[in-house]
Amino acid sequence: MSFKVVIEPRALADIQDGIDYYEDQLEGLGERFSETVDHYIRAISHNPHYQVSHKDYRAVPTGRFPYLIVYYLDEPAETAYVMAVFHTSQNPKKLPK
């Protein structure tokens, strides 16, 4: 069963920051980052319970980019809320609550 995915404003800003950063590093890399994030967000929709689970949230690593897509599930609404796209070098205490 697929869940609806809602991307919260902070996560949208995180994604745009990542795109801008990678595009500044190498032309086309920002687009690859965006495509990678989109791929994993679709994976969350199709299999929301699969990824790493923490007390208050779940997180899926983005493969070749050092980011986690942080989300929580609203089981009754069958919705996954993406709260952040979090660079793994950041302090985990900065994760949204």
Residue positions per predicted region:
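Arg/Lys-rich, positively charged N-terminal/basic patches that mediate binding to nucleic acids
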Residues: M1-S34
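Alpha-helix N-cap/helix-start and coil->helix boundary motif
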Residues: L12, D38, T88-S89
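Basic/aromatic recognition patch in beta-strand/loop cores that engages polyanionic ligands
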Residues: H39, N47-T79
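Enriched for short, Lys/Arg-rich terminal
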Residues: E31, Y72-K97
